[in-house]
Amino acid sequence: MILSEQSWARHANPWSVWTRYAAFPLLVIAVWSYHVIGWWALVPTAAMVGFLYVNPWLFALPRSTQNWASKAVLGERVWLAEGKRYLPDQHARVFHALVVLSLANAAALVWGIVQSDVVLTAISTINVLVGKSWFNDRMVWLFSERVRSNPEYRSWLY
């Protein structure tokens, strides 16, 4: 998804970040509901996917970007803009580990849903959210490092 300058600014609203966190377990429940309501599960699943897609555009500009959630989004913006040009080893190793952990947790989550295993699904959902939080925390760290040497990035803080 490509976001404009304005869309990135709106996505940095903490409400955007926290509602995405809250939406993920709801998405899992929507997919899981296939075991209960059959193909009607596509309705809540599509609604959740739609919400996650439009989420970056739903909220107003944040009153301040001096918070963890906003800095996580700004860090992701830096990471996507700079790619591997600037990614210190301390971050690259962790990002690679997070990719492996995320794939393992996603596979476990899918398996849990397919097998109708409530415990595996719940644990995998929690693990996905923990992994996302760890990734976001790294984005905050990356942003905090880059903001010191880049005036454009500093202008994103208010």
Please report, for each region that a protein language model flagged, where it lies by residue.
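Glycine-rich, aromatic-bearing surface loops/beta-hairpins
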Residues: 116-158
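Hydrophobic alpha-helical membrane-embedded segments
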Residues: 31-63, 131-134
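Cytosolic juxtamembrane N-terminal segments of multi-pass membrane proteins
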Residues: 1-9, 77-84
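Short membrane-interface loop/juxtamembrane segments of multi-pass integral membrane proteins
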Residues: 69-97
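Long, highly hydrophobic alpha-helical transmembrane signal-anchor segments
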Residues: 6-45, 96-107, 113
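Multi-pass alpha-helical transmembrane bundles in non-GPCR membrane proteins
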Residues: 89-127
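Membrane-water interface of transmembrane alpha-helices
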Residues: 53-74, 140-143
